[in-house]
């Protein structure tokens, strides 16, 4: 309930700067559980815009880098929306282990009917097409 209110306030604040249009007629028909949402990431504000608009229908668990998750300002909200903390692999001594653990957590969450929102590239889109490079989390999730 509190998370929906915060997302409502976020939508209102973001609408002061951005014009967002959403065809929600199709969203109202989706009753599935365990939905994997894969938006692209052209700008810094897109994750907040997409998350705040889709929360009312899906209540997705976002994947959030450790540095944002542990930030004292954001941490209460991260707990409120059941965000999944992702280790920053650039500073990680065992990136493969932590990535596999995060993917397994996502798979279990999806199987339990929770919805996940995952930005496949994990970085800003700075070209007309998004390059995923070696980011294979979506492939790994689908295989399981």
Protein language model annotation of sequence segments:
Residues 7, 16-144:
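Soluble catalytic domains of membrane acyltransferases
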Residues 1-9:
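Helix-enriched interaction subdomains in cytosolic or periplasmic regions
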